[in-house]
Amino acid sequence: WEKNKKFETALEMGLLQDKVFITAAYFQNRSSNQLVGIPLPGTTGFTSMQANLNAVVQNTGLEFTVNTTNITNDSFNWKTSFNISVPKNKLVAFRGLQNSAYKEQFRIGEPLNIQLAYNFLGVDPETGIYQFEDVNGDGQITFPDDKQTVVDLSPEFFGGLQNQVAYKRWTLDFLFQFVK
């Protein structure tokens, strides 16, 4: 069975009779024994089988929210909500990683959504050919030996800005989302 340990703490604060309401939260989730699809060879007739992954993954993050009531009266209301989240995750442990099908996909201490890449050194000014680091020193650029630079593809942060404008019985909602 999957095991989860969760911790969350938050601070909420209302100002100006709750016309401005602010929330800040921190969370940490540690999961182990996750149920995942383990890749199978094509000769089996199946792409994967469900099994427990022998790994420990930690997700942490900060979340901030600001809700405001900008204008409110008998016939007109305008409310705004802004939120931003800064998530992080990493592989804490994975017993037997080097002998698993995931050895080229995950690294202990790194985020889960990584891509291994060759370390780009520049362009040879004489030939115009891209130059990459020969990590293992064998004179050839090969996979997987030289593809060791970790590139994190996870978003640094994401959030949104929502506004709700209401006039009598008409309401207009619009939302802008962002990701970096």
Give each language-model segment a name.
Residues 44-52, 102-103:
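Short beta-alpha connecting loops at secondary-structure transitions
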